[in-house]
């Protein structure tokens, strides 16, 4: 039975836990090869996972933000790269469906494609010259208006999930104006190509290669939105990012607990889990995990239960969740490695992969310095 046919969040979470079990077994191979986990995505598509955040009126399930991050965490425990990748699709799909960000006809066609065949989408915004889109740089990718539509030229970096994407949402400066637009480009468009540039030591299986657009021709209605560089409304869907890194931390914690409760060197009686120094680290991991869960889950539920006006005041809060959970997750993985010791650095040990992958969270948006600045501004305004 597909996830989309199950009635409750609990049923879907339990079913997904079973679906992703093979992901854990495949993760080391994909990481070592730096190859894309097509098998994982085929399993997710077969389960109907890409359609969970499609609104009900288009044939999806329209799950809550809280349920979405629980699912993302579950996938990340099995494989962080797969979780981060699919998280962009389910998050953006949810956001567009809730905000009516595109014309009805355009979103309906996309949503139907997701429901019928598991079509996948991601934003393509980052460029080498402009850096992170969150800092407001104007894209060098250019869209030129022609009689029957648009011609787009440019290159986007860090296009996560690009080996399997069906749709790209590309930011481009509109030629002859000061405007920036968001354009929907299908993979089958002429002028669309991929250059395999992804050589990161973290999240190696995300396939975050370059998207190259060479005289890509689009219909006029594929300009789906106008953007204001640097202006980012509150986006609850971005909580898929901290959910992913918390999942990686939980995988590391589970490994460390298993090791501590089964490893019994000849120098002691019992296992190392009974040694006070190890118990301190186990306790600290659990404390940090609980703090992450409560912060992440409570803010997600607040988003689900509040009005759009209140949601737009939550930007500092959402950013704080990302900063806190990612940094706490890094500490959890570090503690796990201290418990396991030097063997955690073995190429065969999953902890070394968790260590590399969890640090990638520092470079996902929003950046820590911008979050702290926004929190400072918030505290000053509230003091007045």
Role assignments for model-derived ranges:
Residues 200-289:
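Glycine-rich beta->alpha junctions and the first turn(s) of the following alpha-helix
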Residues 340-384:
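Glycine-rich phosphate/cofactor-binding loops in nucleotide/flavin-utilizing enzymes
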Residues 24, 28-31, 290-324, 337-340, ...:
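C-terminal helix-coil-helix/basic helical segment that borders enzyme active sites and/or dimer interfaces
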Residues 36-46, 51-153, 160:
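Glycine-rich flavin
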């Amino acid at each position: 039975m597909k996830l989309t046919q199950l009635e409750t969040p609990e049923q879907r979470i339990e079913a997904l836990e079973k679906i992703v079990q093979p992901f854990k077994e495949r993760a080391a191979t994909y990481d070592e090869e730096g190859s894309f986990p097509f098998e994982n995505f085929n399993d997710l598509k077969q389960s109907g996972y890409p359609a969970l955040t499609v609104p009900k009126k288009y044939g999806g399930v329209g799950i809550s933000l809280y349920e979405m991050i629980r699912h993302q965490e579950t996938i990340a425990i099995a494989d962080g790269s797969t979780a981060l990748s699919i998280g962009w699709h389910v998050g953006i799909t949810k956001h567009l469906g809730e905000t009516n960000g595109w014309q009805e006809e355009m979103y309906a066609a996309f949503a139907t494609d997701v429901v019928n065949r598991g079509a996948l989408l991601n934003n393509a915004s980052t460029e080498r010259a402009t850096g992170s889109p969150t800092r407001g740089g104007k894209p060098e990718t250019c869209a030129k208006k022609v009689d029957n539509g648009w011609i787009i030229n440019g290159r986007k970096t860090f296009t996560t999930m690009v080996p399997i994407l069906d749709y790209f949402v590309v930011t481009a400066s509109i030629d002859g104006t000061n405007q920036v637009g968001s354009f929907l480009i299908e993979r089958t468009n002429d002028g669309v190509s991929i250059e395999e540039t992804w050589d990161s030591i973290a999240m190696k299986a995300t396939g975050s290669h370059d998207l190259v657009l060479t005289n890509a021709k689009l219909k006029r209605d594929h300009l789906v939105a106008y953007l204001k560089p640097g202006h980012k409304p509150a986006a609850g869907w971005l909580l898929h990012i901290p959910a992913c890194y918390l999942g990686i931390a939980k995988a590391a914690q589970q490994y460390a607990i298993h090791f501590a409760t089964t490893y019994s060197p000849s120098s002691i009686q019992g296992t190392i889990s009974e040694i006070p120094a190890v118990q301190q680290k186990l306790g600290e991991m659990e404390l940090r995990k609980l703090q992450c869960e409560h912060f992440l889950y409570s803010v997600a539920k607040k988003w689900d239960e509040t009005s759009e006006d209140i949601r737009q005041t939550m930007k500092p809060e959402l950013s704080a969740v990302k900063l806190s959970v990612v940094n706490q997750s890094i500490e959890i993985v570090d503690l796990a490695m201290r418990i396991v010791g030097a063997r955690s650095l073995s190429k065969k040990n999953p902890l070394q992969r968790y260590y590399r992958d969890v640090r990638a969270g520092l470079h996902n948006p929003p950046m820590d310095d911008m979050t702290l600045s926004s929190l400072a501004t918030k505290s000053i305004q509230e003091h007045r």
